[in-house]
Amino acid sequence: MRKLYTGAFGLQACLLLTFAGLAQAQDKPKDAYLYVTYFYCDVTQQERADQIFDQLDRSFYDAAFADATITNYGWLAHQTGGKWRRALYNGAPTIQALLDSQKKIGAQIDAKNKKLSDEEGKICNSHDDYIWKAVAGNTVTAARGSAAFSTYYICDSNREKQADALVKQVFAPIYDKLMADGKLKSWGWLEHIVGGEYRRLATMSGADMKTVLEARASVNQALMDNPLGDTFTDICGSHTDYMWEIKYSKP
């Protein structure tokens, strides 16, 4: 049988619980998710895909950002790395909002110019989809630079949360200082929600690739001879690096 609180004590207790719950909700950072499509493209035609994105897709992503359907977006071009040639991302506070935005924007693009959309799809005719959740950093909220370095990790699934804690404890202060010094525009650590084999994503952006690579070298130097850095490597021991040109993005 449930006990019902009555009178002044009951009201006071309820108010305390209410305000405690509100305080916890305010203290807890908002969830942020990214839906990223990594494209395999015809390398002889990939610049045409960039043109189509600018001519057709971009205005709909700008509008979705302006009306808060999405929290950010970006179109990335491969510079160095694996087989992905282009990447398209957009953010939202929930997974359902991500899926809804994908459906809405895709329908708008096809309705505007199905022929051009199909041409884009033929150039980049295969892809891998991932949903990431932000764990640390500001990459889902900050205006990014024109160049990005992303590392996609394969990790020990039993120790992924330990890797997250190490990033917050060891890596975050280094990245934050690089941002404070103007050497980075953004950085982020994200966890896998849906997608392929990669379990964690570390990404940073800057004004240009030279600046980003210098920042990355600073991070590596700061972690040299740090046993916690070695522990992180034990957990996430395999990775693939990509250097991206951020061709279009918001914010």
Name the predicted role of every residue range.
Residues Q24-A111, D118-P251:
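Short S/T/G/P-rich N-terminal loop/turn motif that feeds into the first structured element of a domain
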Residues M1-L4:
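Positively charged n-region of N-terminal signal peptides that target proteins for export
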